[in-house]
Amino acid sequence: MESSGRVVIYLTRHGKTILNTLDRVQGWADSPLTEEGALVAHDLGHGLKGTNFVAAYASDRGRAIETARIVMKESENHHLKLEQLPEIREFGFGKFEGEYNQTVLKMVAKAHGFESIESYYDKTAANNSNIVIDTVHKMDETGMTENSAIFEKRLAAGLDTILQDTQNRGGGEVLVVAHGMVIHRIIEMIDPSKNLRIIENASVTKVIFENGAYSIEEPGNMFYVEAGKKAQGGV
C-alpha cells in the first residue's frame, strides 16, 4: 500500500454467537462465539493471509474482540495491538435485548401496518436499518436505546477515529470487526444502493477512503472465508 493516505477498511461482522444461534436479539448484550462461530473466524483469518494490516480495531463487545483476535492470529497480523472502539458497538435494543428476533421484527412491521417485516420491505421497497432503529427507539420506554441520528453520529465518530489514526500511519489496510446493524448503517451512510438484506457472520465489506471521499466495495463478501476453507483443505 502506497503512503498516499488511501485507507481500506475490511469491515467484518463477528462470528456466530450463542444468541445468534438461538435467533435472539443481541445488541449491547453479549454472548460468546459458538464452535461454528470460532471456526468461521479461523477460516476468515486464513483467507486474509498475505493482507498486511496496519491496524486492527474491534467494538468493545466480547464477540467482536474474540473474532478479531482469531482473525489477527490466523492472518499473521497478531503483532498488532487490537484497539477497542465503543463507537462501533452494536445498536442497543433496550428492553428488547435477548428477545426473539422475529418477535421484535414483527412488532416493528405491525407499527407500520404490516404483518411481517418482509411484507413491509417488499411493499415499500425499503431496506433501511433506520426503520428498525427508530421504531425500536419509540417502543422502548427504558431510555436505553438510541435513535438513528444518535446511532449514526456515534458510528461516524468511530469511522473518523479509524480514518485519522490510519492516515497518520500513511494509509493502508485496516481490520475492523463490528456488528450487523453497524455494517448496515455504515453502508447506508456511504452508498445506500450497496446495502444488503442480510450481513453474514464473518463477511467482509470494504470501506475505502480515497480522494476525500468514502466508497463501498464488495458488501457482505464471503470470499475470504471460502478462500480460507480451501487453503486448509476444506470444501
Regions found by a protein language model. Give the residues of each.
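An N-terminal RHG(E/S)-centered segment typical of histidine phosphatases
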Residues: 1-53, 61-62, 69-73, 77, ...
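Acidic, low-complexity terminal tails and accessory targeting/binding regions
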Residues: 1-7, 91-103, 164-172, 184-235
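Phosphate-coordination/substrate-recognition cap region in phosphate-metabolizing enzymes
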Residues: 3-4, 45-121
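Beta-strand elements within well-structured catalytic alpha/beta cores of enzymes
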Residues: 8-12, 57, 83, 169-178
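Short glycine/proline- and acidic residue-enriched helix-loop micro-motifs
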Residues: 111-150
